[in-house]
Amino acid sequence: MSEQVALNPSEISELIRKKIDQFSVVSEARNEGTIVSLKDGIVRLHGLADVMAGEMIEFPGGVYGLALNLERDSVGAVILGDSSTLAEGQKGKCTGRILEVPVGKGLLGRVVDALGNPIDGKGPIESSGMSPIEKVAPGVITRKSVDQPVQTGLKAIDAMIPVGRGQRELIIGDRQTGKTAIAIDAIINQKGTGVKCVYVAIGQKASSVASIVRKLEEHGALEHTIVVVAGASDSAALQYIAPYSGCTMGEYFMERGEDALIVYDDLTKQAWAYRQISLLLRRPPGREAYPGDIFYLHSRLLERAARINADEVEKLTNGEVKGKTGSLTALPIIETQAGDVSAFVPTNVISITDGQIFLDVDLFNSGVRPAINSGLSVSRVGGAAQTKIMKKLGGGTRLALAQFRELEAFSQFASDLDDATRKQLERGQRITELMKQKQYSPLTVAEMGVSLFVVEKGYLDDVPVNEISSFEASLHDYMRSTHAALLHAINEAGAYDNEIEAKLKKAVEEFKNTGSW
Protein backbone atom coordinates (compact mmCIF):
# COMPACT_ATOMS: atom_id res chain seq x y z
CA MET A 1 0.00 0.00 0.00
CA SER A 2 1.44 3.36 -1.03
CA GLU A 3 2.27 5.78 1.71
CA GLN A 4 -0.07 8.75 1.80
CA VAL A 5 1.51 12.25 1.80
CA ALA A 6 -0.02 14.58 4.33
CA LEU A 7 -0.71 18.02 2.85
CA ASN A 8 -0.73 20.87 5.31
CA PRO A 9 -2.78 23.76 3.89
CA SER A 10 -1.02 26.40 6.03
CA GLU A 11 2.40 25.33 4.68
CA ILE A 12 1.17 25.52 1.08
CA SER A 13 -0.30 28.99 1.60
CA GLU A 14 2.97 30.10 3.24
CA LEU A 15 4.97 28.82 0.23
CA ILE A 16 2.66 30.61 -2.18
CA ARG A 17 2.92 33.84 -0.15
CA LYS A 18 6.75 33.62 -0.24
CA LYS A 19 6.76 33.05 -4.01
CA ILE A 20 4.48 36.05 -4.52
CA ASP A 21 6.69 38.25 -2.31
CA GLN A 22 9.83 37.21 -4.21
CA PHE A 23 8.24 37.62 -7.67
CA SER A 24 9.34 40.90 -9.21
CA VAL A 25 7.24 42.57 -11.89
CA VAL A 26 8.99 45.33 -13.82
CA SER A 27 6.68 46.82 -16.38
CA GLU A 28 7.98 49.04 -19.14
CA ALA A 29 5.59 51.28 -21.01
CA ARG A 30 6.97 51.78 -24.50
CA ASN A 31 5.73 53.77 -27.42
CA GLU A 32 6.48 51.49 -30.37
CA GLY A 33 5.86 51.71 -34.08
CA THR A 34 6.30 49.33 -36.99
CA ILE A 35 8.47 50.01 -40.04
CA VAL A 36 6.15 50.07 -43.05
CA SER A 37 8.66 51.26 -45.65
CA LEU A 38 12.43 51.62 -45.82
CA LYS A 39 14.30 53.11 -48.77
CA ASP A 40 17.17 55.54 -49.46
CA GLY A 41 17.93 55.98 -45.75
CA ILE A 42 14.36 57.14 -45.06
CA VAL A 43 12.10 55.02 -42.85
CA ARG A 44 8.32 55.35 -42.46
CA LEU A 45 6.78 54.06 -39.23
CA HIS A 46 3.18 53.36 -38.32
CA GLY A 47 1.87 53.41 -34.73
CA LEU A 48 4.21 55.92 -33.05
CA ALA A 49 1.62 58.06 -31.30
CA ASP A 50 3.60 60.39 -29.00
CA VAL A 51 6.75 61.06 -31.02
CA MET A 52 8.16 64.61 -31.01
CA ALA A 53 9.70 66.46 -33.96
CA GLY A 54 13.46 65.92 -33.91
CA GLU A 55 13.20 63.02 -31.43
CA MET A 56 15.59 60.06 -31.57
CA ILE A 57 13.95 56.76 -32.54
CA GLU A 58 15.71 53.53 -31.57
CA PHE A 59 15.72 50.56 -33.95
CA PRO A 60 17.00 46.99 -33.43
CA GLY A 61 20.79 46.61 -33.49
CA GLY A 62 21.50 49.99 -31.86
CA VAL A 63 20.61 51.98 -34.99
CA TYR A 64 19.01 55.40 -34.42
CA GLY A 65 16.77 57.57 -36.55
CA LEU A 66 15.67 61.20 -36.38
CA ALA A 67 11.93 61.96 -36.63
CA LEU A 68 11.46 64.74 -39.19
CA ASN A 69 7.98 64.27 -40.69
CA LEU A 70 4.99 63.86 -38.34
CA GLU A 71 1.95 62.93 -40.43
CA ARG A 72 -1.59 61.86 -39.51
CA ASP A 73 -1.02 58.10 -39.73
CA SER A 74 2.77 57.71 -40.02
CA VAL A 75 6.13 59.18 -39.03
CA GLY A 76 8.96 59.87 -41.52
CA ALA A 77 12.42 59.48 -40.02
CA VAL A 78 15.94 59.64 -41.41
CA ILE A 79 18.43 56.91 -40.43
CA LEU A 80 21.64 58.07 -38.74
CA GLY A 81 24.23 55.58 -39.87
CA ASP A 82 23.91 52.17 -41.50
CA SER A 83 20.37 51.06 -42.43
CA SER A 84 21.40 47.70 -43.94
CA THR A 85 20.40 45.78 -40.78
CA LEU A 86 16.83 47.15 -40.78
CA ALA A 87 13.84 45.57 -42.49
CA GLU A 88 10.13 46.23 -42.91
CA GLY A 89 8.06 44.87 -40.04
CA GLN A 90 10.70 45.62 -37.39
CA LYS A 91 9.85 47.82 -34.42
CA GLY A 92 11.07 51.33 -33.72
CA LYS A 93 10.59 52.89 -30.30
CA CYS A 94 10.61 56.45 -28.97
CA THR A 95 13.51 57.40 -26.71
CA GLY A 96 12.10 60.67 -25.34
CA ARG A 97 15.46 62.33 -26.13
CA ILE A 98 16.58 64.73 -28.82
CA LEU A 99 19.92 64.22 -30.55
CA GLU A 100 22.89 64.97 -28.27
CA VAL A 101 26.66 65.01 -28.83
CA PRO A 102 29.59 64.90 -26.37
CA VAL A 103 31.17 68.26 -25.46
CA GLY A 104 34.19 69.39 -23.47
CA LYS A 105 37.95 69.94 -23.56
CA GLY A 106 38.53 66.21 -24.07
CA LEU A 107 37.47 66.66 -27.71
CA LEU A 108 40.33 69.07 -28.50
CA GLY A 109 42.94 67.49 -30.75
CA ARG A 110 40.51 64.79 -31.90
CA VAL A 111 38.72 63.91 -35.14
CA VAL A 112 35.08 62.87 -34.62
CA ASP A 113 32.06 62.02 -36.77
CA ALA A 114 28.79 63.99 -36.80
CA LEU A 115 27.56 62.12 -33.69
CA GLY A 116 30.76 62.81 -31.72
CA ASN A 117 32.24 59.30 -32.04
CA PRO A 118 36.06 59.28 -32.46
CA ILE A 119 37.31 58.24 -35.92
CA ASP A 120 41.03 58.98 -35.50
CA GLY A 121 42.00 55.69 -33.83
CA LYS A 122 43.23 57.41 -30.64
CA GLY A 123 40.83 55.63 -28.30
CA PRO A 124 37.71 56.83 -26.46
CA ILE A 125 37.04 60.49 -25.67
CA GLU A 126 36.67 61.80 -22.11
CA SER A 127 33.86 64.30 -22.58
CA SER A 128 32.46 66.71 -19.99
CA GLY A 129 28.90 65.63 -20.76
CA MET A 130 26.31 65.63 -23.53
CA SER A 131 24.57 68.60 -25.10
CA PRO A 132 21.69 68.80 -27.63
CA ILE A 133 22.66 69.74 -31.19
CA GLU A 134 19.70 72.10 -31.59
CA LYS A 135 19.65 75.10 -29.23
CA VAL A 136 17.95 78.48 -29.22
CA ALA A 137 20.39 81.25 -30.22
CA PRO A 138 21.31 83.88 -27.57
CA GLY A 139 18.80 86.74 -27.38
CA VAL A 140 19.45 90.45 -27.92
CA ILE A 141 19.76 91.24 -24.19
CA THR A 142 22.31 88.49 -23.50
CA ARG A 143 24.60 89.58 -26.35
CA LYS A 144 27.50 92.00 -26.19
CA SER A 145 28.69 94.09 -29.14
CA VAL A 146 31.69 92.84 -31.12
CA ASP A 147 34.81 94.81 -30.13
CA GLN A 148 37.69 92.31 -29.93
CA PRO A 149 39.53 91.12 -33.05
CA VAL A 150 40.10 87.59 -34.34
CA GLN A 151 43.48 87.87 -36.06
CA THR A 152 43.58 85.63 -39.13
CA GLY A 153 47.26 86.37 -39.79
CA LEU A 154 46.41 87.37 -43.38
CA LYS A 155 47.24 91.00 -44.25
CA ALA A 156 44.45 91.33 -46.80
CA ILE A 157 41.78 90.29 -44.28
CA ASP A 158 43.06 91.90 -41.07
CA ALA A 159 43.68 95.23 -42.85
CA MET A 160 40.65 95.48 -45.16
CA ILE A 161 37.98 93.02 -43.95
CA PRO A 162 38.61 92.62 -40.19
CA VAL A 163 36.81 89.87 -38.27
CA GLY A 164 35.70 90.37 -34.66
CA ARG A 165 35.02 87.82 -31.92
CA GLY A 166 31.38 86.79 -32.17
CA GLN A 167 31.04 87.80 -35.84
CA ARG A 168 29.82 85.63 -38.75
CA GLU A 169 32.06 86.27 -41.78
CA LEU A 170 31.23 84.34 -44.94
CA ILE A 171 34.01 83.04 -47.22
CA ILE A 172 32.52 82.71 -50.69
CA GLY A 173 33.98 81.77 -54.07
CA ASP A 174 34.15 79.16 -56.82
CA ARG A 175 35.80 75.79 -56.30
CA GLN A 176 39.61 75.84 -56.12
CA THR A 177 39.94 79.52 -55.19
CA GLY A 178 41.53 79.03 -51.76
CA LYS A 179 38.49 79.18 -49.44
CA THR A 180 39.62 76.34 -47.16
CA ALA A 181 43.20 77.72 -47.18
CA ILE A 182 42.00 81.01 -45.61
CA ALA A 183 40.02 79.15 -42.92
CA ILE A 184 42.93 76.80 -42.09
CA ASP A 185 45.36 79.75 -41.88
CA ALA A 186 42.94 81.45 -39.46
CA ILE A 187 42.87 78.30 -37.28
CA ILE A 188 46.69 77.99 -37.33
CA ASN A 189 46.98 81.67 -36.31
CA GLN A 190 44.91 81.05 -33.13
CA LYS A 191 47.79 78.99 -31.69
CA GLY A 192 48.77 80.47 -28.33
CA THR A 193 45.84 82.95 -28.22
CA GLY A 194 43.51 80.74 -26.15
CA VAL A 195 40.89 80.67 -28.93
CA LYS A 196 39.53 77.12 -29.34
CA CYS A 197 38.69 76.08 -32.92
CA VAL A 198 36.18 73.70 -34.50
CA TYR A 199 36.58 72.66 -38.14
CA VAL A 200 33.47 71.01 -39.64
CA ALA A 201 34.11 69.17 -42.93
CA ILE A 202 30.86 68.50 -44.82
CA GLY A 203 30.77 66.24 -47.88
CA GLN A 204 34.53 66.34 -48.44
CA LYS A 205 36.80 63.55 -49.65
CA ALA A 206 38.41 61.60 -46.81
CA SER A 207 41.85 62.24 -48.38
CA SER A 208 41.27 66.04 -48.27
CA VAL A 209 40.27 65.91 -44.60
CA ALA A 210 43.29 63.71 -43.74
CA SER A 211 45.56 66.24 -45.47
CA ILE A 212 44.02 69.14 -43.48
CA VAL A 213 44.38 67.24 -40.17
CA ARG A 214 48.03 66.52 -41.02
CA LYS A 215 48.69 70.20 -41.79
CA LEU A 216 47.07 71.29 -38.50
CA GLU A 217 49.23 68.76 -36.65
CA GLU A 218 52.42 69.93 -38.42
CA HIS A 219 51.78 73.54 -37.37
CA GLY A 220 50.85 72.66 -33.77
CA ALA A 221 47.24 73.77 -34.27
CA LEU A 222 45.46 70.43 -33.80
CA GLU A 223 45.80 70.59 -30.00
CA HIS A 224 43.37 73.55 -29.84
CA THR A 225 41.05 72.23 -32.61
CA ILE A 226 38.15 69.77 -32.86
CA VAL A 227 37.65 68.31 -36.35
CA VAL A 228 34.09 67.14 -37.11
CA VAL A 229 33.77 65.07 -40.28
CA ALA A 230 30.72 64.07 -42.32
CA GLY A 231 32.51 62.93 -45.45
CA ALA A 232 31.34 62.39 -49.02
CA SER A 233 30.78 58.69 -48.25
CA ASP A 234 28.58 59.44 -45.20
CA SER A 235 24.80 59.58 -45.44
CA ALA A 236 22.95 62.83 -46.24
CA ALA A 237 21.53 62.76 -42.68
CA LEU A 238 25.01 62.97 -41.13
CA GLN A 239 26.05 65.74 -43.55
CA TYR A 240 22.90 67.64 -42.52
CA ILE A 241 23.51 67.40 -38.75
CA ALA A 242 27.34 67.81 -38.73
CA PRO A 243 27.32 71.67 -38.60
CA TYR A 244 24.89 71.62 -35.64
CA SER A 245 27.08 69.08 -33.81
CA GLY A 246 30.17 71.23 -34.37
CA CYS A 247 28.30 74.35 -33.25
CA THR A 248 27.29 72.67 -29.97
CA MET A 249 30.92 71.68 -29.34
CA GLY A 250 32.00 75.30 -29.92
CA GLU A 251 29.18 76.71 -27.76
CA TYR A 252 30.51 74.73 -24.78
CA PHE A 253 33.55 77.07 -24.71
CA MET A 254 31.49 80.23 -25.35
CA GLU A 255 29.18 79.42 -22.44
CA ARG A 256 32.21 79.12 -20.12
CA GLY A 257 33.56 82.59 -20.87
CA GLU A 258 36.08 81.48 -23.50
CA ASP A 259 36.49 82.39 -27.16
CA ALA A 260 35.91 79.87 -29.95
CA LEU A 261 36.15 79.92 -33.75
CA ILE A 262 34.13 77.56 -35.97
CA VAL A 263 34.61 76.89 -39.68
CA TYR A 264 31.80 75.25 -41.70
CA ASP A 265 33.38 73.81 -44.86
CA ASP A 266 31.05 74.09 -46.66
CA LEU A 267 27.37 74.94 -46.15
CA THR A 268 26.53 74.42 -49.84
CA LYS A 269 26.98 70.68 -49.32
CA GLN A 270 24.81 70.79 -46.18
CA ALA A 271 22.07 72.51 -48.23
CA TRP A 272 22.38 69.78 -50.88
CA ALA A 273 22.10 67.06 -48.21
CA TYR A 274 19.04 68.73 -46.68
CA ARG A 275 17.44 69.10 -50.13
CA GLN A 276 18.01 65.37 -50.73
CA ILE A 277 16.42 64.43 -47.38
CA SER A 278 13.46 66.78 -47.93
CA LEU A 279 12.73 65.42 -51.41
CA LEU A 280 12.91 61.83 -50.14
CA LEU A 281 10.48 62.78 -47.34
CA ARG A 282 8.16 64.11 -50.09
CA ARG A 283 8.22 67.69 -48.83
CA PRO A 284 7.12 70.18 -51.52
CA PRO A 285 10.10 71.61 -53.45
CA GLY A 286 10.57 75.33 -54.07
CA ARG A 287 13.20 77.39 -55.89
CA GLU A 288 16.06 75.23 -57.27
CA ALA A 289 14.18 72.24 -55.74
CA TYR A 290 15.17 73.35 -52.20
CA PRO A 291 12.50 73.00 -49.49
CA GLY A 292 10.72 76.06 -48.11
CA ASP A 293 12.75 76.18 -44.87
CA ILE A 294 16.24 76.21 -46.44
CA PHE A 295 16.80 79.78 -45.15
CA TYR A 296 15.91 78.66 -41.63
CA LEU A 297 18.35 75.74 -41.96
CA HIS A 298 21.27 78.20 -42.12
CA SER A 299 19.88 81.08 -40.06
CA ARG A 300 19.26 78.98 -36.94
CA LEU A 301 22.82 77.63 -37.23
CA LEU A 302 24.62 80.93 -37.83
CA GLU A 303 22.60 82.93 -35.28
CA ARG A 304 24.16 80.74 -32.58
CA ALA A 305 27.52 82.42 -33.24
CA ALA A 306 27.58 85.40 -30.88
CA ARG A 307 29.41 87.26 -28.16
CA ILE A 308 27.57 86.87 -24.86
CA ASN A 309 27.92 89.19 -21.88
CA ALA A 310 29.49 88.38 -18.49
CA ASP A 311 26.09 88.10 -16.71
CA GLU A 312 24.97 85.39 -19.14
CA VAL A 313 28.26 83.47 -18.71
CA GLU A 314 27.86 83.66 -14.92
CA LYS A 315 24.28 82.36 -15.21
CA LEU A 316 25.22 79.51 -17.58
CA THR A 317 28.11 78.38 -15.34
CA ASN A 318 26.03 78.73 -12.11
CA GLY A 319 28.36 81.45 -10.82
CA GLU A 320 31.61 79.54 -11.43
CA VAL A 321 32.91 82.01 -14.06
CA LYS A 322 32.55 85.70 -13.23
CA GLY A 323 33.42 88.83 -15.22
CA LYS A 324 34.24 87.06 -18.50
CA THR A 325 32.44 87.31 -21.82
CA GLY A 326 32.26 84.34 -24.18
CA SER A 327 32.23 84.30 -27.96
CA LEU A 328 31.73 81.96 -30.91
CA THR A 329 33.00 83.34 -34.23
CA ALA A 330 31.74 81.60 -37.38
CA LEU A 331 33.48 81.38 -40.76
CA PRO A 332 30.93 79.66 -43.00
CA ILE A 333 32.13 78.72 -46.50
CA ILE A 334 29.88 78.76 -49.57
CA GLU A 335 30.89 77.43 -52.98
CA THR A 336 29.50 79.32 -55.98
CA GLN A 337 29.02 78.02 -59.51
CA ALA A 338 30.84 80.18 -62.11
CA GLY A 339 30.97 83.17 -59.73
CA ASP A 340 27.17 83.41 -59.41
CA VAL A 341 26.65 85.01 -55.98
CA SER A 342 22.99 85.71 -56.82
CA ALA A 343 22.01 82.01 -56.64
CA PHE A 344 19.57 80.93 -53.93
CA VAL A 345 21.85 79.59 -51.15
CA PRO A 346 24.64 82.21 -51.57
CA THR A 347 22.15 85.12 -51.31
CA ASN A 348 20.56 83.51 -48.24
CA VAL A 349 23.86 83.14 -46.40
CA ILE A 350 25.10 86.61 -47.47
CA SER A 351 21.95 88.10 -45.90
CA ILE A 352 22.41 86.11 -42.66
CA THR A 353 26.11 86.85 -42.09
CA ASP A 354 27.89 90.05 -40.97
CA GLY A 355 29.98 90.36 -44.12
CA GLN A 356 31.70 88.27 -46.76
CA ILE A 357 35.17 87.60 -48.14
CA PHE A 358 34.71 87.14 -51.88
CA LEU A 359 37.36 85.10 -53.69
CA ASP A 360 37.87 85.66 -57.41
CA VAL A 361 38.92 82.97 -59.92
CA ASP A 362 40.64 85.51 -62.22
CA LEU A 363 42.70 86.94 -59.34
CA PHE A 364 43.62 83.42 -58.21
CA ASN A 365 44.72 82.41 -61.71
CA SER A 366 46.76 85.61 -62.11
CA GLY A 367 48.79 84.72 -59.00
CA VAL A 368 47.11 87.02 -56.44
CA ARG A 369 46.72 84.72 -53.44
CA PRO A 370 44.73 84.96 -51.23
CA ALA A 371 42.49 85.91 -54.20
CA ILE A 372 40.35 88.41 -52.26
CA ASN A 373 38.21 90.77 -54.33
CA SER A 374 38.38 93.90 -52.16
CA GLY A 375 35.51 95.56 -54.03
CA LEU A 376 32.91 92.87 -53.30
CA SER A 377 34.23 91.89 -49.84
CA VAL A 378 32.96 93.65 -46.74
CA SER A 379 32.97 93.32 -42.95
CA ARG A 380 29.87 94.89 -41.42
CA VAL A 381 30.84 94.81 -37.73
CA GLY A 382 34.57 93.98 -37.70
CA GLY A 383 35.75 97.61 -37.97
CA ALA A 384 34.92 98.19 -34.30
CA ALA A 385 37.14 95.25 -33.35
CA GLN A 386 40.23 96.29 -35.34
CA THR A 387 43.43 97.13 -33.46
CA LYS A 388 44.51 100.79 -33.64
CA ILE A 389 47.58 100.15 -35.79
CA MET A 390 45.61 98.12 -38.36
CA LYS A 391 42.81 100.70 -38.48
CA LYS A 392 45.19 103.62 -38.89
CA LEU A 393 47.52 102.06 -41.47
CA GLY A 394 45.10 99.75 -43.29
CA GLY A 395 42.31 102.29 -43.74
CA GLY A 396 43.52 103.66 -47.08
CA THR A 397 44.51 100.28 -48.50
CA ARG A 398 41.02 99.23 -49.51
CA LEU A 399 40.22 102.55 -51.19
CA ALA A 400 43.56 102.57 -53.02
CA LEU A 401 42.95 99.03 -54.31
CA ALA A 402 39.39 99.85 -55.43
CA GLN A 403 40.64 102.94 -57.33
CA PHE A 404 43.47 100.88 -58.82
CA ARG A 405 41.06 98.23 -60.17
CA GLU A 406 38.94 100.97 -61.78
CA LEU A 407 41.94 102.76 -63.30
CA GLU A 408 43.48 99.48 -64.43
CA ALA A 409 40.39 98.65 -66.49
CA PHE A 410 40.35 102.20 -67.92
CA SER A 411 44.11 102.36 -68.65
CA GLN A 412 43.89 99.38 -70.99
CA PHE A 413 42.12 101.63 -73.51
CA ALA A 414 44.02 104.89 -72.86
CA SER A 415 47.24 105.42 -74.79
CA ASP A 416 48.88 108.15 -72.71
CA LEU A 417 48.34 108.60 -68.97
CA ASP A 418 49.07 111.68 -66.86
CA ASP A 419 51.56 111.46 -63.97
CA ALA A 420 48.93 111.32 -61.22
CA THR A 421 47.14 108.38 -62.85
CA ARG A 422 50.40 106.55 -63.48
CA LYS A 423 51.47 107.04 -59.85
CA GLN A 424 48.14 105.71 -58.64
CA LEU A 425 48.46 102.65 -60.90
CA GLU A 426 51.98 101.97 -59.65
CA ARG A 427 50.87 102.35 -56.02
CA GLY A 428 47.98 99.93 -56.69
CA GLN A 429 50.35 97.37 -58.22
CA ARG A 430 52.60 97.61 -55.16
CA ILE A 431 49.68 97.20 -52.73
CA THR A 432 48.41 94.19 -54.74
CA GLU A 433 51.90 92.66 -54.60
CA LEU A 434 52.18 93.38 -50.86
CA MET A 435 48.82 91.74 -50.12
CA LYS A 436 50.04 88.42 -51.55
CA GLN A 437 50.88 85.89 -48.87
CA LYS A 438 52.03 82.28 -48.86
CA GLN A 439 49.79 79.62 -47.33
CA TYR A 440 50.55 78.44 -43.75
CA SER A 441 52.62 81.58 -43.04
CA PRO A 442 50.41 83.83 -40.89
CA LEU A 443 51.89 87.12 -39.69
CA THR A 444 51.70 88.81 -36.28
CA VAL A 445 49.94 92.18 -35.85
CA ALA A 446 53.32 93.95 -35.64
CA GLU A 447 54.63 92.33 -38.84
CA MET A 448 51.43 93.28 -40.69
CA GLY A 449 51.72 96.79 -39.23
CA VAL A 450 55.28 97.15 -40.56
CA SER A 451 54.19 95.99 -44.05
CA LEU A 452 51.27 98.43 -44.12
CA PHE A 453 53.49 101.23 -42.75
CA VAL A 454 56.00 100.98 -45.63
CA VAL A 455 53.26 101.16 -48.28
CA GLU A 456 51.29 103.90 -46.50
CA LYS A 457 54.34 106.15 -46.04
CA GLY A 458 55.65 105.62 -49.58
CA TYR A 459 58.76 103.60 -48.73
CA LEU A 460 57.90 101.12 -51.50
CA ASP A 461 57.65 103.73 -54.26
CA ASP A 462 61.25 103.21 -55.39
CA VAL A 463 61.23 99.41 -54.94
CA PRO A 464 60.60 97.46 -58.19
CA VAL A 465 57.30 95.52 -58.10
CA ASN A 466 59.03 92.16 -58.64
CA GLU A 467 61.26 92.77 -55.57
CA ILE A 468 58.50 93.69 -53.12
CA SER A 469 58.09 90.14 -51.80
CA SER A 470 61.80 89.77 -50.97
CA PHE A 471 61.87 93.35 -49.60
CA GLU A 472 59.05 92.53 -47.18
CA ALA A 473 60.58 89.20 -46.04
CA SER A 474 63.99 90.85 -45.45
CA LEU A 475 62.36 93.77 -43.60
CA HIS A 476 60.54 91.37 -41.26
CA ASP A 477 63.78 89.47 -40.57
CA TYR A 478 65.59 92.76 -39.89
CA MET A 479 62.84 93.97 -37.52
CA ARG A 480 62.82 90.65 -35.64
CA SER A 481 66.59 90.69 -35.17
CA THR A 482 67.22 94.37 -34.34
CA HIS A 483 63.87 95.81 -33.20
CA ALA A 484 62.27 92.88 -31.35
CA ALA A 485 61.21 95.13 -28.43
CA LEU A 486 59.25 97.43 -30.78
CA LEU A 487 57.47 94.46 -32.41
CA HIS A 488 56.65 93.04 -28.96
CA ALA A 489 55.21 96.40 -27.81
CA ILE A 490 52.97 96.60 -30.91
CA ASN A 491 51.82 92.98 -30.52
CA GLU A 492 50.96 93.51 -26.84
CA ALA A 493 48.84 96.64 -27.19
CA GLY A 494 48.16 96.98 -30.93
CA ALA A 495 48.56 100.72 -30.41
CA TYR A 496 49.79 103.30 -32.90
CA ASP A 497 50.92 106.78 -31.83
CA ASN A 498 53.53 109.39 -32.75
CA GLU A 499 56.23 107.59 -30.74
CA ILE A 500 55.63 104.23 -32.49
CA GLU A 501 55.43 105.99 -35.87
CA ALA A 502 58.81 107.69 -35.25
CA LYS A 503 60.41 104.39 -34.20
CA LEU A 504 59.01 102.57 -37.26
CA LYS A 505 60.19 105.38 -39.55
CA LYS A 506 63.72 105.22 -38.09
CA ALA A 507 63.83 101.40 -38.35
CA VAL A 508 62.58 101.30 -41.97
CA GLU A 509 65.01 104.04 -43.06
CA GLU A 510 67.89 102.14 -41.40
CA PHE A 511 66.84 99.00 -43.28
CA LYS A 512 66.54 100.78 -46.63
CA ASN A 513 70.03 102.23 -46.19
CA THR A 514 71.45 98.71 -45.84
CA GLY A 515 69.97 97.74 -49.24
CA SER A 516 70.02 94.12 -48.08
CA TRP A 517 66.97 92.83 -49.86
Swiss-Prot record:
Residues annotated as site: Required for activity: 377
Annotated ATP binding sites: 173-180
Keyword Chaperone: no
EC numbers, comma separated: 7.1.2.2
Catalysed reactions, as listed in the record: ATP + H2O + 4 H(+)(in) = ADP + phosphate + 5 H(+)(out)
CDD domains: ATP-synt_F1_alpha_C (cd18113), ATP-synt_F1_alpha_N (cd18116), F1-ATPase_alpha_CD (cd01132)
Chief localization: membrane
Pfam family, one: ATP-synt_ab_N
Record's subunit section: F-type ATPases have 2 components, CF(1) - the catalytic core - and CF(0) - the membrane proton channel. CF(1) has five subunits: alpha(3), beta(3), gamma(1), delta(1), epsilon(1). CF(0) has three main subunits: a(1), b(2) and c(9-12). The alpha and beta chains form an alternating ring which encloses part of the gamma chain. CF(1) is attached to CF(0) by a central stalk formed by the gamma and epsilon chains, while a peripheral stalk is formed by the delta and b chains.
Protein name listed in UniProt: ATP synthase subunit alpha 2
Organism the protein comes from: Legionella pneumophila subsp. pneumophila (strain Philadelphia 1 / ATCC 33152 / DSM 7513)
Lineage: Bacteria, Pseudomonadati, Pseudomonadota, Gammaproteobacteria, Legionellales
